[in-house]
Structures are given as C-alpha cells and as structure tokens.
C-alpha cells in the first residue's frame, strides 16, 4: 500500500548551509558584508511504482481489457523537492550618522506534488518551478540626537511555472505557413495566425481558430490512447496531466519612516509606503485527441475554457502616525494607519447576469486605529491591554482570475471589487517575573474577522446559453476567534545549564459554514444556502508546546534540545450511514496530534573558522498522527464501509489482471 514505508534512508533529506560575514578589505571597515547560502533537497515520504509509461495504451470497451505495462517497475519518489536560498547584504557606513545598505534575497525551488491517481504512472504528473528575487536599497540617517529616518526602495519578482515535460513560452513561438520545414526539435512551438487546412510534416490538419499554437514534435500522449475507463474509479493507465500554469508578479515600491524623541514622555513615529504590483497569469491545457486535435494544440487565449490569460496592475498606498507615551505609572502606544488600494481593473456589473458587461472597480480606503497600554503593578509585573483594527487585501488571483462563459461551463472568476478582510482584535494580559530566571505570562484575546472570502456558486439564466452557473469570490464569510494563552519561561542558569519554554492555548474559531464548502445562490428560484456558525476547519481548541534545552555556549559549546507539541485534532464533518439525519458541518474532531523532535549540536573552531556539527531527529517517538481520516469512524485505520461494495462486478472480474488495482490500494 505504501512503497518503501518501512525502509530507512539516511540521505532522503539533504541540507547544506553556509554563512559568511565581515569587512571588505581595503575599505577601513566601513564596508561590510553578510551572506548566506542554503541548499536543501528531499525525496519525500510518498512513493509510487512505474508500472505504466505516459505513452501506454489501454482499451476498456471490450470484456477482455487491454492494458499496456510499459513502465520499468521502479519505485519512484512522488513528492520530491529541492530549494536554494541565498542572501547578500552590503552595508557602507559613511559616518556615525549615515549608513547605506543594499540587500538581495533569492530563492529557487523545484518540486513535484503527490497525486494518488498517478501512483502507478508517476511520469504523468506535472512539475513546478518557482523563483523569487527581492532587492532593496536603504539609507539610515540620524538627523540629530533625537531624530532619525529610514528610506528605502525595493523590488520583488516572482516567477512560478507548472508544466509537463518542459515549460512553454508562447512569445517565442515561430510563425508557420503550410508546408514549412520546421525540423525535429521536440520543444518546437509553432504559431498559426489564421484557421484553415495546413500540411504539417506528414499530417494534413484543420486549424479551427485564429492565433493557435501547435507542438508538432512534442512527447505528449493523445487522450485516445486510453479508450473508455473501468467501471469503478482506479489509477492512471497512461497519459499525463497536460495542464500548464505560468504566473509572474513584480512589485516596485518605496518606504519612508521617521522617528523622533520629542521629549522624555513622547516618541513619535510616522511613515508612508507606495507600491505597484503587477501580475499576469496564463493557464492552458494541451489539446490532443487524434481526432479534432491531431497534433498537440494550444487554443487561442480567452477564446475557450482551455486557455485563459490576464495581466493586471494594482496600487497600494499606506501611511501611519504613532505616539509612544512613557510615564512612571504607565506606557501607552497610540496610533492610526491609513491604507488605500486601487485595483485599476473592472468587474462584472451584475452578479445575476455576468455576461451583461463590466464596470470600473472602486478604490478602497481604510483607517485603522490602534492602542496599546502597559501598566506596571509591581517592579516585576505588568498588566497590558491592546486594541486594533487590521486589514488584509485579497490575493491578486482572487481579484483578477479570468475565465470563459459558455454552454455547459461553470467557470470560476475573480472579482476586482472585493473589500479587504477586516480584523478587530482585543487582548488583555499580565506578565510577572517570579525569580531571576523564571517568568509567567497570561493573556485573553478576541478577534472579530469580517469580509472573509468565500466562493459563491450562482445559477442564472444566460441570454445566450440558457440556464447556466458560475462561481465567484465574494466577501461573504465571517469568523470569530477567542481564547486564552498561558506560558512559563525559564532562562538558562549557569548551574543547571537548562532553559525551557512552556505554553498552553485554548481557543475557539467559529464562522460561517455551508455543507458544500461554498455559498450557493439560485437566481432562478431566489434560494440561497443557509448559513451556519460552526467550528472552522483550522480550529484546534487545545494546544500545548514545550521546549527544553541544555546548552553550554561558546566556540566549543554544545547543546541538546527537545521540542514537543500536543494538540486536539481538527474538526471534520462526520458521515454516519443509515443514521437518518445529516450531522452539522465540522461537528466532530480528528484524534489528538502529538510530536517530539530533538536537536543535538557541537561547536568547534579550526584556523579561526567556526564549525557546528548537528543532528536533528524528527518524530523521536515514531508517532503516527491521524491527519486524514475516514469520516464515518473518525479514524484513519479502519472504516465501516466495505470498499469492495463500491466496485462493480465487472471490475471485480478483472481482479488480478496486470495493472488493475483495487480500492484498498
């Protein structure tokens, strides 16, 4: 069931880290650098078996099923990943009052996600590449003894690709005319401007649309290689995921902050930020069925559901003013923040007739008051209180996602007039030092979160296509979080060399919920799905964390740490067969979750270079947490449902055939 689950692999996860810092030679120690590099890779813990290849054929239209087994039979890692993270910072100290710095942060990653359907055809999965580059330049200037400012500009570029075989760049496609010789490069991408008959190699094909792309030499397998399907759900017998996603985002902005100690009681801070975000996303699927699309084809953008593209900009502007008041009897922080967001786009004018037209999105302006008070009750104890408003804008994908309306389609679209998520938070707590090394902390908190996003399904009567439906992201959700946290901190003392941190949290997280996972409205009948207040999917009522460390600091120091966690399971919606009623959403909980990790290290130096040897052990007790469960039992180990009853007699007749796997697998 789980290939290689009992095998121990010492090198499954590999990490290499390096840190370098110091002054640049010949600069009089005015120019310094700080750099780091980290490479990590792992095969993951889920494996498949390569029984099939992408180009295998199968036929399920006959009683005697035909199934090709073109794979090597090798065991293949199904969720591998690798990443490279880098940092370089240069700092130039012009004078004691002026300092310039520049910083680069980069990350590159590649991964494949586990897809159960492709367990026996692992080459059919997509792969993902991600790159992120962040550059910033900053100046710190102390104007006087009591005032200083920071100003910096920054850029952030993100590039994400998900594809099969190799990434495709439509801008690099070669214009094609019928009969042209295009060679045998398997990565070749051709662009055909007009519909018609075309001679492409040995194939005479019909191009149906303007601005079509074709891949005449690609390795994609036709969907007709697999004829029919077994009468019960099973695994992939060949073929691949032909979907592609390309997402590029770029941010450019600047920020200015100034701080001034006006007098002994007032420290004033103020600042503003301006940022422009750009996002474009292209999502398409390769069409190849040996009939309508006899050569792997990419349909024109935004002309069919198989190819969508959008490019949008948004502007963010924010500013704040804060005053820190320090008196002998209390400390208070008073502040107000202003945020403005301009999506610079359009959205559908009528939710009940999304094809009617679009109107311009409104600019969103938000004011956020905030206050924090600390009141000493003894020389070693403090009471504190805070209250504030916080806003979070939706992701740009939820604002701008583009799709196609049409007969029989149920597209999901973005809505650029979304409001920001609003959180109002209250917290009251106490800190008390019990001794030189031990302190306790306790607080109660409450969060009121409104305008959360929900995916609303809407049925409407299309003037073009008749009864239709679509889904759109809207501000429909609400949640409430309340709870208490208690913690105990023990600083390291020279005698025992031990430090510890223990905390316990109790909280409830409730909000709107619907059984389908999205709000539903039928414009034809006026019916809307009933809203219920239930525990949300990420709610964990009880969480206990503990960290205990024994350390000896220094160049030749050592240390041993244990990190443990115990928590209640997440909510789930039970399914009770033949019970005669439908349970409320998230009305039961998964089993407790627990973990214990360990870290051991030893420092040493060689030729004035510091080294650290360390050992990390995750899940020391080899505890198997039940994160995914059967919703009739609430456990992952068993179910009352006989899975074989879900398989037809026609399917059972092929038990034991090569390539046929049961539901239990």
Model feature map: region roles:
Residues 70-77, 231-245, 253, 261, ...:
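Signature of Gram-negative outer-membrane beta-barrel scaffolds
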Residues 25-29, 95-97, 144-146, 263-265, ...:
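Outer-membrane beta-barrel channels and translocator barrels
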Residues 445-449, 459-461, 465-574:
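Gram-negative outer-membrane beta-barrel transporters
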Residues 14-18, 84-88, 131-137, 153, ...:
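Hydrophobic, lipid-facing positions within transmembrane beta-strands of outer-membrane proteins
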Residues 37-43, 106-110, 155-159, 274-280, ...:
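Transmembrane beta-strands of outer-membrane beta-barrel pores
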Residues 150-154, 376, 382-388, 392-394, ...:
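Membrane-embedded beta-barrel scaffold of Gram-negative outer-membrane proteins
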Residues 557, 563-579, 602-665:
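C-terminal beta-signal and adjacent terminal beta-strands/loops
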Residues 8-110, 130-148, 369:
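Transmembrane beta-barrel wall of Gram-negative outer-membrane proteins
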């Amino acid at each position: 069931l789980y290939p290689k689950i009992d095998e121990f692999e010492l090198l499954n996860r590999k990490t290499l880290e390096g840190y370098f810092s110091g002054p640049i030679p010949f600069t009089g120690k005015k120019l310094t650098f700080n750099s780091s590099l980290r490479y990590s890779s792992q095969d993951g813990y889920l494996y498949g078996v390569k029984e099939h290849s992408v180009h295998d054929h199968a036929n399920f239209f006959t009683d005697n099923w035909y199934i090709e087994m073109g794979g090597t039979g090798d065991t293949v890692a199904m969720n591998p990943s690798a990443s490279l993270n880098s940092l370089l910072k240069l700092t130039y100290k012009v004078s004691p009052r002026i300092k310039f710095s520049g910083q680069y942060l980069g990350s590159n990653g590649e991964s494949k996600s586990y897809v159960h359907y492709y367990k026996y055809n692992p080459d059919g999965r997509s792969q993902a590449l991600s790159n992120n580059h962040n550059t910033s330049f900053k100046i710190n200037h102390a104007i006087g003894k009591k005032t200083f400012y920071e100003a910096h500009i920054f850029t952030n570029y993100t590039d994400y690709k998900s594809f099969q075989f190799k990434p495709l760049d439509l801008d690099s496609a070669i214009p094609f005319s019928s009969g042209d010789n295009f060679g045998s490069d398997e990565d070749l991408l051709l662009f055909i401007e007009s519909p018609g008959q075309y001679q492409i190699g040995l194939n005479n094909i019909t191009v149906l649309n303007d601005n079509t792309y074709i891949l005449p030499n690609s390795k994609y397998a036709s969907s007709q290689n697999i004829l029919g399907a077994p009468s019960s759900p099973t695994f992939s017998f060949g073929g691949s995921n032909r979907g592609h996603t390309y997402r590029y985002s770029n941010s450019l902005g600047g920020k200015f902050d100034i701080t001034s100690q006006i007098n002994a009681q007032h420290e004033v801070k103020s600042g503003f930020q301006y940022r422009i975000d750009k996002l474009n996303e292209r999502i398409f699927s390769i069409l190849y069925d040996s009939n309508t699309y006899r050569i792997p084809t990419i349909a024109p953008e935004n002309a069919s559901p198989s190819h969508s593209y959008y490019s949008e900009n948004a502007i963010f502007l924010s500013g704040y003013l804060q005053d820190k008041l320090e008196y002998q009897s209390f400390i208070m922080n008073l502040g107000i923040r202003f945020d403005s967001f301009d999506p610079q786009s359009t959205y559908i004018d009528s939710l009940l007739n999304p094809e009617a037209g679009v109107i311009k999105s409104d600019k969103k302006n938000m004011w956020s008051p905030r206050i924090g008070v600390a009141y000493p009750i003894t020389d070693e104890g403090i009471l504190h209180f805070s209250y504030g408003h916080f806003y979070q804008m939706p992701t740009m994908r939820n604002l701008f996602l583009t799709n196609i309306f049409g007969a029989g389609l149920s597209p999901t679209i973005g809505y650029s007039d979304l409001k920001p998520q609003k959180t109002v938070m209250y917290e009251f707590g106490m800190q008390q030092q019990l001794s030189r090394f031990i302190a306790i902390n306790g607080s109660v908190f409450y969060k009121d979160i409104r305008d959360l996003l929900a995916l609303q399904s809407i049925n409407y009567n299309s003037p073009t296509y008749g009864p239709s439906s679509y889904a759109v992201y809207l501000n429909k959700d609400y949640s409430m979080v309340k709870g208490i946290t208690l913690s105990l901190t023990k600083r390291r003392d020279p005698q025992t060399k031990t430090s510890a941190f223990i905390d316990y949290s109790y909280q409830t997280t409730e909000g709107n919920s619907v059984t389908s996972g999205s709000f539903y409205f039928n414009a034809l009948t006026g019916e809307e799905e009933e809203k219920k207040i239930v525990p949300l999917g990420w709610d964990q009522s009880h969480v206990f964390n503990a960290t205990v460390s024994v350390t000896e600091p220094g160049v030749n120091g050592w240390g041993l740490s244990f990190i443990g966690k115990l928590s209640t399971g997440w909510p789930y919606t039970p399914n009770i067969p033949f019970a005669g009623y439908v349970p409320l959403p998230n009305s039961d909980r998964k089993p407790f979750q627990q973990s214990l990790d360990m870290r051991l290290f030893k420092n040493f130096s060689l030729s004035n270079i510091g080294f650290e040897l360390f050992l990390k052990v995750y899940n020391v007790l080899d505890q198997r947490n039940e994160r995914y469960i059967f919703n009739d039992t609430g456990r992952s180990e068993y179910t009352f449902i006989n899975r074989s009853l879900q398989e037809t007699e026609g399917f059972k007749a092929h038990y034991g055939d090569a390539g046929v796997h049961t539901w239990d697998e």
